[in-house]
């Protein structure tokens, strides 16, 4: 098994990603290969936001207002019917949004730890590392439009308010 498919690698990668987007300077001990992969994921989330700016602006704020309580519901809804690279980039973009817009940038708090634990647990528990080969990361970036992601985002835009009102909706 490739080290990039191990839970330990992804736990390290998710932590480094969240610390990077939180602008925390504690990355001295992180392996350079992990930092290269973090850079790739950041590039993907930037591309994701360029393609889906209207959904990003309209839905993340209200949907993630109570992120501590409802983050796992959002992730479950995101992956309920299919797992693909576009949706996994959306997973990372949700974490990025929480770090940049909801939590205090430039620090690493208990809330950051909670976000890190939630994302890591969900990613590993659902074995997402076997659906997201980093070797193909930029190929996935160019295929955003063909992965059905536009449909997914429109569906999420409709169901997020219901998810966060306590109803579990399957897209």
Curated annotation (Swiss-Prot):
Main location: host cell
InterPro entries cross-referenced by the UniProt entry: Apo_reg_M11, Bcl-2-like_sf
Subcellular localization(s) per the UniProt record: Host cytoplasm
Disulfide bond as UniProt keyword: yes
GO biological process per UniProt: regulation of apoptotic process; symbiont-mediated suppression of host apoptosis; symbiont-mediated suppression of host autophagy
Pfam families the record matches: Bcl-2_3
Domain of life: Viruses
Gene Ontology CC annotation, any one: host cell cytoplasm
Keywords: Disulfide bond, Host cytoplasm, Host-virus interaction, Inhibition of host apoptosis by viral BCL2-like protein, Inhibition of host autophagy by virus, Modulation of host cell apoptosis by virus
Record's subunit section: Interacts with host BECN1; this interaction inhibits host autophagy. Interacts with host BAK1 and BAX.
Function noted in UniProt: Plays a role in the protection against apoptosis mediated by cytotoxic cells during the immune response to acute and persistent viral infection. Contributes therefore to latency establishment. Plays also a role in the inhibition of host starvation-induced autophagy which ultimately contributes to the viral chronic infection.
Protein name: Apoptosis regulator Bcl-2 homolog
Gene: vBCL2
